[in-house]
From Swiss-Prot:
The species this protein was found in: Zobellia galactanivorans (strain DSM 12802 / CCUG 47099 / CIP 106680 / NCIMB 13871 / Dsij)
Gene it is expressed from: agaD
SUPFAM superfamilies in the record: Concanavalin A-like lectins/glucanases (SSF49899)
Protein name: Beta-agarase D
Function text: Cleaves the beta-1,4-linkages between beta-D-galactose and alpha-L-3,6-anhydro-galactose residues in agarose. Cleaves agarose in a random manner with retention of the anomeric-bond configuration, producing beta-anomers that give rise progressively to alpha-anomers when mutarotation takes place. Requires at least 4 consecutive agarose units and is highly intolerant to modifications.
Chain residue ranges for the region called Disordered: 382-402
Residue intervals of the GH16 domain: 22-378
A GO BP annotation: carbohydrate metabolic process
One Pfam family from the record: Por_Secre_tail
An annotated Gene Ontology molecular function: beta-agarase activity
Catalytic reaction equation(s): Hydrolysis of (1->4)-beta-D-galactosidic linkages in agarose, giving the tetramer as the predominant product
Region forming the signal peptide: 1-20
Residues annotated as catalytic: 174, 179
Family: Belongs to the glycosyl hydrolase 16 family.
Length: 477
């Protein structure tokens, strides 16, 4: 009997050691791995920063227990040689502005009185501003689609940029996971941008014929009702790089934006979805220009993402074919985390002033963890690195009948459930024990249920207003 108990304890400890080792273990993955797929953690690229790394003036690798995951500078060139780019605008990246302590990555900014840096302004005129010294790190493991990258971050209460991004080694393809200017400034000069998170990407033609495209639609500056500034808030933010032409953005576990080849779906500040596509461009060649309205890219509104895609013939990834590869993200990318004093902010005199820079805590970016997953076949999911999205059991009793106008079909379903009304935005599927087996956004009035096994479940669908409806569904093979 004692031997059995001892073996059980050993087995439990082995399980706990294998499966309870990361800070994010109890945080469900919000993105969909795809039909027949599950998520597998990429341990080399992921980090929960539960170790100590002290600032140094030297370029060094660092990570937990000798497992070197990062180097403390901007990413290297494709040939592995150092990249001497110091940073945008008045930014000067410094190795000694990076540390790991207290369970967080710390990247901060500072100034040296009298130090300035010159850069070229928007009208090709030279501009000089106080030099902002800041930290920058690069992951030693590159990523490529399909991949989900998510971080838990305390956004700086600063007009400086809190950044997590992906960049190809040749600097031509960029996906911005988070670009946030979270502080309004002591005179509220940055209040508009402080209330937004910029969900964007870039494609470039590099010098001598430099060109830079990024989405310029109003919805790329994402906001949420009740949030007047992101600075000082701790958020989860991630991107699911699904394919060369599809990006899905998540904030605090909720999908908020999709770029799908030639159309866009964005969750507005009130929680409702808006579906848009470009109203036009002057040309789809390299010399083309966006059609703008009130300073932003002019977009047409559609009734659904599929409707927008059917009506659009202009890429939202690379409308001017800068990449010359079929208008798609095709290259593996480096994961970069840094702080920046960006040129357009500095030119507009929205950089932190001396008094604001004196507050170290407002200008220190904290990253609790960053995790990276790739989808694998569910049948092959048998290692400790494989993670499903099943949540802890809920206290649940089926309740509330759907209104007569609402229909959920087919019955039984195999791969997709259709919902007859368009105002439902989120769905959860429970088994009869009350466990959440599936959690997804409702897209185009459809729910992908292909990952569910045969059986009877309870579907709970929620409107943007918070109103919910629950009913039984049947899944067949």
């Amino acid at each position: 009997m004692k031997r059995s108990i001892l073996l059980a304890i050993i087995a439990f400890l082995q399980f706990f050691t294998s499966y309870g080792q990361y800070d994010w273990d109890n945080v469900p993955i919000p993105a969909n791995a795809g039909a027949g797929k599950t998520w597998k953690l990429q341990t080399a690229a992921s980090d929960d920063f539960n170790y100590t790394f002290n600032p140094t003036n030297n370029v060094v690798d660092f990570g937990p227990n000798g497992n070197m995951k990062w180097y403390n500078k901007y990413h290297n060139r494709p040939n592995g040689q150092p990249n001497n780019f110091e940073g945008p605008g008045p930014t000067k990246w410094m190795q000694n502005h990076v540390a790991v302590s207290g369970g967080n990555l710390n990247i901060w900014a500072s100034r040296i009185p009298g130090a300035t840096k010159s850069f070229t302004g928007s009208n090709n005129t030279p501009i000089s501003r106080p030099e902002t010294r800041a930290g920058c790190i690069t992951n030693k493991t590159r990523v490529k689609y399909p991949v989900f990258v998510e971080a838990r971050v305390k956004v700086m209460n600063s007009t400086l940029a809190s950044d997590i991004w992906l960049l190809s080694p040749d600097d031509t393809q960029e996906i911005d996971i988070m670009e946030c200017y979270g502080g309004p400034g002591n005179d509220n000069r940055n209040s508009y941008f402080a209330s937004k998170i910029h969900l964007s990407h870039h494609v470039f033609i590099r010098p001598p014929n430099f060109k830079d495209y990024q989405p310029a639609d109003l919805n790329s500056w994402w906001g949420k009702n009740g949030v007047t500034q992101w600075g000082g808030k701790t958020i989860r933010i991630g991107v699911n790089w699904v394919s060369p032409t599809r990006l899905e953005y998540f904030v605090d576990g909720q999908m908020v934006r999709i770029l799908d080849n030639d159309a866009v779906q964005t969750r507005l500040a009130d929680g409702t979805w808006q579906y848009t596509y470009p109203a036009g461009v002057t040309s789809t060649g390299v010399n083309g220009q966006l059609i703008k309205e009130n300073g932003y890219q002019k977009m047409n509104i559609a009734s659904s993402l599929s409707d927008a895609k059917n009506k659009s013939n202009i890429s939202v990834i690379d409308p001017f074919n800068y990449l010359n590869n079929g208008r798609k993200f095709s290259k593996e990318m480096d994961i970069i985390i840094n702080v920046e004093d960006q040129s357009w902010q500095a030119e507009a005199y929205r950089s932190p002033n001396a008094a604001e820079m004196a507050n170290f805590y407002d200008n220190n970016l904290l990253v609790d963890w960053i995790r990276v997953y790739k989808p694998v076949n569910a049948s092959a999911a048998n290692s400790a690195e494989t993670t499903s999205t099943v949540e802890k059991p809920a206290s649940f009793e089926p309740q509330g009948q759907p209104t007569e106008k609402l229909q959920v079909y087919p019955v039984p379903a195999t791969d997709v459930l259709n919902i007859s009304q368009s105002d439902y935005v989120e769905a959860r599927v429970y088994n009869l024990k009350g466990w959440v087996m599936l959690r997804k956004d409702v897209i185009d009035q459809k729910i992908d249920v292909s990952s569910l096994k045969k059986g009877i479940y309870i579907l709970e669908i929620t409107k943007a207003t918070g109103e919910t409806v629950k009913q039984k569904i049947v899944i067949s093979e």
